[in-house]
């Protein structure tokens, strides 16, 4: 009888512990989410800080650490938590909902910037096209100017040549006029010699 009476009270506290576990704290996932929400850290809450929060606010058993690790991994895989730092259960975690709420606000800004940037890009393109058109004649002008720059040097030479050419006929005419006089002069001494 003593053995049975000793066994019965031993069994009752086990049941009461099980009932206490069910009633003392909510699910680990809920506790982890509550811990992350309570911290509200920009860099995210670490697993150690989550464990401390749960142990301080809830009555948890000895295997709480392992349960917290498993539940954190499940929450990350399900998408409710996002891991900001580290790998696996070790690292910093944020609520995915909070990130999603922040991201849509950022996305439209990016879209606005993208929408504005093509307009800005379109304007320089138009501006680039117009100078390109202007540049083409400029290039032609430059090409014309370059030989023009080279030409001024030969052009005076040509002008000088033309002047000399113009002067040559005059000189030639003068020379021609002088030439007949010279042979006459030469002929005159010959004639004088013959006369002698």
Curated annotation (Swiss-Prot):
Q: Tell me if Ribonucleoprotein is a UniProt keyword of this record.
A: no
In terms of InterPro entries, this protein maps to:
H1/H5, Histone_H1/H5_H15, WH-like_DNA-bd_sf, WH_DNA-bd_sf
> Which residues does the UniProt record annotate as the domain H15?
24-97
Q: Is Protein biosynthesis there in the keyword field? A: no
Subcellular localization(s) per the UniProt record: Nucleus; Chromosome
Gene3D superfamilies associated with the record: Winged helix-like DNA-binding domain superfamily/Winged helix DNA-binding domain (1.10.10.10)
Q: Where is the composition biased (Basic residues)?
A: 104-196
GO molecular function per UniProt: DNA binding; structural constituent of chromatin
> SUPFAM superfamilies from the entry?
Winged helix' DNA-binding domain
Broad class of the protein's primary localization? nucleus
Q: Where is this region: Disordered?
A: 1-29, 78-196
User: What's in the keyword line of the UniProt record?
Assistant: Chromosome, DNA condensation, DNA-binding, Nucleus
Q: Which SMART domains does its entry note?
A: H15
CDD domains, per the entry: H15
The Gene Ontology biological process annotation of the record reads:
chromosome condensation; nucleosome assembly
Its GO CC terms are: nucleosome; nucleus
**PROSITE patterns the record matches:** H15
- Report the protein's function: Histones H1 are necessary for the condensation of nucleosome chains into higher-order structures. The histones H1.0 are found in cells that are in terminal stages of differentiation or that have low rates of cell division.
UniProt lists the family membership as follows: Belongs to the histone H1/H5 family.
What's the protein name? Histone H1.0
Q: Gene behind this chain?
A: h1-0
């Amino acid at each position: 009888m003593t053995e049975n009476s000793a066994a019965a009270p031993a069994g009752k506290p086990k049941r009461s512990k099980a009932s206490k576990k069910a009633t003392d704290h909510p699910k680990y996932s809920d506790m982890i989410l509550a811990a992350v929400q309570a911290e509200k850290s920009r860099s995210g809450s670490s697993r150690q800080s989550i464990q401390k929060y749960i142990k301080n606010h809830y009555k948890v058993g000895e295997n709480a650490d392992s349960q917290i690790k498993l539940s954190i991994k499940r929450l990350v895989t399900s998408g409710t938590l996002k891991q900001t730092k580290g790998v696996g259960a070790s690292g910093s975690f944020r609520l995915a909902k909070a990130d999603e709420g922040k991201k849509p606000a950022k996305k439209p800004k990016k879209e606005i910037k993208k929408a504005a940037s093509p307009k800005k890009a379109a304007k320089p393109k138009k501006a680039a096209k117009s100078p390109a058109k202007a540049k083409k004649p400029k290039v032609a002008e430059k090409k014309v100017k370059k030989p023009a720059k080279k030409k001024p040097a030969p052009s005076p030479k040509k002008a000088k040549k033309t002047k000399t050419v113009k002067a040559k006929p005059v000189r030639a005419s003068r020379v021609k006029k002088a030439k007949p006089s010279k042979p006459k002069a030469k002929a005159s001494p010959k004639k004088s010699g013959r006369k002698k």
